[in-house]
């Protein structure tokens, strides 16, 4: 048997064109005809199978599109959460937003208001003073905090003030000797003090645990910077510091004195005591007179 060589087609392509199977049909009729010609099943079964395949493909595409649309609805087309099906998050109220921009209302009035002045005496413990007044309509607890608790302490470290009450607190600080020809002004920002306040229900004993138990209601009143003053040079800040320290010392001495006794001495500005003394003197004089007569 003689083998003949296959001639190329007129379009210049090889003979593999006869075996080419199109992956995508150009029309529905050609798809139906090809299915009917190549399918081993009857034409009715082929149509049913094709229809079922198209239905499943359409259902899968619809589910995928619905799932994708749901994701877009939750995250938004740009992933920014702007979709229609996104659950609305509770937006803050206008009052809360406005309150966040308002400055915190002060409960205490401080004098000095922003700085603590100390005489600069290296190697010694020096003092400063600050006047604290409760300007609110309720009882307020306050306490000191410092960035250098080892070298600074306050007296009192905290207290509870009634409405309108004023106290002068004394602040003690050890002044470190200068290093490398350091100037006093170079130390003004190293140590800071912070005064915290807390509204309380009424008069009570001060305990530091109040600020831990009600930390959500604690307010920061002021952060005070340390300023050193030359004790050899007179200036208004130094003179004011001396006056406040004298007031603080007088208040401490007044608290040390025992309370006056409440008794007969308080009745009639001492009339009871004076009458008792007169009676005793008359009694002693009478006893002396009787003794002289007996002799």
Swiss-Prot record:
Keyword Phosphoprotein: yes
Domain MSP as annotated: residue spans: 107-229
Record's compositionally biased regions (Low complexity): 31-53
Ranges for region Disordered: 1-99, 249-270
Source organism of the structure: Arabidopsis thaliana
Family classification: Belongs to the VAMP-associated protein (VAP) (TC 9.B.17) family.
Listed Basic and acidic residues bias regions: 1-10, 249-263
Keywords on record: Phosphoprotein
GO cellular component: endoplasmic reticulum membrane
Stretches with biased composition (Polar residues): 83-98
Biased composition (Basic residues): 54-71
Gene that produces this protein: PVA42
Residues bearing PTM Phosphoserine: 294
Top-level taxonomic group: Eukaryota
Protein role: May play a role in vesicle trafficking.
Protein name as catalogued: Vesicle-associated protein 4-2
